[in-house]
UniProtKB/Swiss-Prot annotation:
The lineage of its organism: Eukaryota, Metazoa, Chordata, Craniata, Vertebrata. Belongs to the frog skin active peptide (FSAP) family. Rothein subfamily. The keyword Ribonucleoprotein does not apply. Keywords: Amidation, Amphibian defense peptide, Secreted. The keyword Secreted applies. GO terms for biological process: defense response. It is found in: Secreted. This is Rothein 3.1. Expressed by the skin dorsal glands.
Length: 30
């Protein structure tokens, strides 16, 4: 499960979505 997917489950953490999406992209690129 991706970090972004976990955040999508909680609307209270909307501000973290862009950050975690970026982290997911970085991890995928490794």
């Amino acid at each position: 499960a991706s970090a972004a997917g976990a955040v999508r489950a909680g609307d209270d953490e909307t501000l973290l979505k862009p950050v975690l999406n970026s982290l997911d992209n970085l991890v995928s690129g490794l």
